[in-house]
């Protein structure tokens, strides 16, 4: 290379830097030309410009707009039309009259614990969603509906009109989302965000079937607009974010596969080189597809299990063990930086144990995974507390805000430990953490904690609603899981809404005004596993207790755990 060429390359550092680039270019890590109202790089790439951060020069002062081509002129209906004038990031006087609800919603979504969120996901809730709240009516309506729901059903600030404001705003948001879906005026991403917020509203009100429908709608919309065959209309970073939400479906409902189809098998190079959260999301997505297929064979004779299912089980376990090996938590005291990795490891460990036992009908099979269960508990205990929670999670004169995050976090792993690890002290440590873990998507720590308590009472022969505190020092003999016999162990359990009625299509409809919809915990226990396998284990079944004489079932009230 000649000296002249080398010198020319070095002068590149003198090019004007992009300090106020649009959110889309920043997420893609490309230089933005800062054209207003939409940057030309986004338009040329057929992407929706998400607007500019606070402090960015206005259209009149932007040097790049003076010579912009006609392509840079965006119609008023585009996604970033609101970003063409003054800064719009969480400015109170630019919000609608219902701004307190939007501010409450954004505060909850931004300031809840990080858990497994990566940097892009943190920016998504702190920047992209507030930006779209100003520029897209359907997102604004959905955000305000979420704020109303949180205020009425979580904070319970006005018990006399519970649900009325939420219902009114929910209907408005639903109509605007349907209008956006029919026209795609602002592209798919605002529609997906609106669907996700509507699903969160249903989850907070414990109408999980309706929430499932909204989440599936967002995932179907994402799948149809992120195809690699055509020009994708959604950044792949956001595809990864929504793909993670699909795991809620598989973890919450027993034997249900994720909505999105499985991806090609992940390679060792991809496990090693990819970001931990993205590689784990892909591993878990494939794993829960396997678990869904294998669950039907859990209570069958070993000889009728297809050999390819056993081979697939080995492949899934190998992938998860490799991920755990590649993503160790550093021994140094860096909990703040490792919070996301700690949470990801708990999710992987829970899936590893579940996949290992999914083809074994005996609950005693879980006793072999004490180290994995105990690492889940110690990892959650090592998470840093929410910084200045009393100050940062307050809203006006309301009480301290309870955390809510749409993404997966720690509730499912803790709930899994409390139910399946029969060590007396470790399961109580998991239960103690569970009831304080807030809300994550369809999961509620308080509700899952109450359901897990019923399992502990049943398995340990303790009177219903008795204290679960253990007096005295640790006793390795008494605490050993082997003390709980197979015939006393609960196989399946979960919160149910017994007051709900099914319509002619089997859909569950709840009383709109009811605060609590999950009022009971449904428990299934096999009295004689060997006799059940002998009499009923000749064909795969998703509900082995139906038509069998070897199962007992009952319901306990869901009572708060002190």
Residue ranges and their predicted role:
Residues 176, 183, 221, 323-327, ...:
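Residue position in alpha-helical solenoids
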Residues 188-196, 335-358, 390-435, 443-458:
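Amphipathic alpha-helical protein-interaction segments enriched in hydrophobic
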Residues 20-23, 30, 37-40, 344, ...:
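Cys/His-enriched microdomains
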Residues 169, 176, 214, 372, ...:
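Alpha-helical solenoid repeat scaffolds, predominantly canonical TPR units
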Residues 55-58, 78-136, 140-149, 154-312, ...:
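Intrinsically disordered, low-complexity acidic/Ser/Thr-rich segments used as protein-protein interaction/activation
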Residues 1-28, 44-129, 135, 139, ...:
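Intrinsically disordered, low-complexity regulatory regions with latent secondary structure
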